[in-house]
């Protein structure tokens, strides 16, 4: 097959993922890229604490901001294009990295098959995540790595990787040592003229960009390591056991490909002289997992740069096995791998956690068209776990919005709880303490929440009508910060009988549906928790006292000031 046809096939799959993948994965896809770019370009948006503290580099958001600026100049900056175009560009980069993987592996058929079918790469390959960019750059760098020559071209994408994601150095340190050990060039000269020079150029440019946009001299890779590694801030968002990457993380990312990967590991260990590249890749994979395992906070996406390394090991082993395997075995193996990847790719890309993505066009319409009695625009309150949805980048209207924040304990206060934790501990108290009642027009015009919360704040919602119910997930999971682990420990240590209710409280943070409520205007019928076609009985307005009669802890505090 001609290389151009190979690239076009890969490109078609990656571009298809842009439009097939319509589910929510992690907040960083929006809050650390699109949201930042939107604020840079259009002057409004939300910057999370990471940008205030300077632990994120502006390099990636600036690339997206460049796209936004072009769209704005052409007067094509519709919300739809602001969402789709960055994903298309990321898909193009992912497609090129996949093509380079095919070339790197010797243009083997198994390589093309294995780079196209992984469920996790289909699921994340077009998302605007720094981890996706890192995985693409890692693959490109590996394809230029001097496995059998003296090229140092790989140092450029590798250096960019390490600047944007300092943890990438864990991958490139053993590979760089391997390069230096095998090189026939003078080692000191190679280090000074290539490694140090390229590193300084990339770091210098990155520091200059970040210093300008952060407004002060700053080295974001150092700040990243200081907060996430040395201060262990990441553990606030969840901790996992040391073996998680080995027992859960990498096997989940590989999915059904774990089976041929194990086969590849066994073949490489038994016949390491036949698999010199796979041997070095396995050493790199193992060392990377060991180092990452030392950090308490772990996520699937953190091992996505290891995916091309694992796929190479699989390709190497299956290509040699294919020489002696029967045609039936070959087709059966390929079919099992294909089906085993298509199923999770389809479910996670189209069904699970689709609510936030389907929600945003509805909020966009509200932001564009809604006006209250005083002709004021919408103001929207998200009573959900923090960053449960995209934000201004998907609405592209400068309306007032508010969500529950979840900054970590940067000041190391005792008994610290973020705003989201405080809200879900006692939603009614939080509402009474933070939302003004007089006049009723001071209430948020719209409230967005997951369905289990509605019953807990039913009195508050009597001033609203149900506008939209959006299906979110067939299966919900526990949400929350490190406080969940702390509460588990306390409950178990005290042999508390309330563990079940404690977990139920956490479970109620998310739900199967997302509900959008709209504030009642004067003279409108009070139809609490009832959709247009729901058929639910309307509660008697005398069952509860009017909300304006409730006593507030802080009546004068305005949520949207």
Curated annotation (Swiss-Prot):
Disulfide bonds: none annotated. One of its GO terms (biological process) is GPI anchor biosynthetic process. Its main location: endoplasmic reticulum. Glycans are attached at residues 398, 456. It is found in: Endoplasmic reticulum membrane. One of its GO terms (cellular component) is endoplasmic reticulum membrane. Residues 525-546 are annotated as: Disordered. Its EC number is 2.4.1.-. Pathway: Glycolipid biosynthesis; glycosylphosphatidylinositol-anchor biosynthesis. The chain crosses the membrane at residues 3-25, 64-84, 110-130, 155-175, 195-215, 246-266, 275-295, 328-348. GO terms for molecular function: alpha-1,2-mannosyltransferase activity. Belongs to the glycosyltransferase 22 family. PIGB subfamily. Mannosyltransferase involved in glycosylphosphatidylinositol-anchor biosynthesis. Transfers the third alpha-1,2-mannose to Man2-GlcN-acyl-PI during GPI precursor assembly. This is GPI mannosyltransferase 3. It comes from Drosophila melanogaster (Fruit fly). The gene is PIG-B.
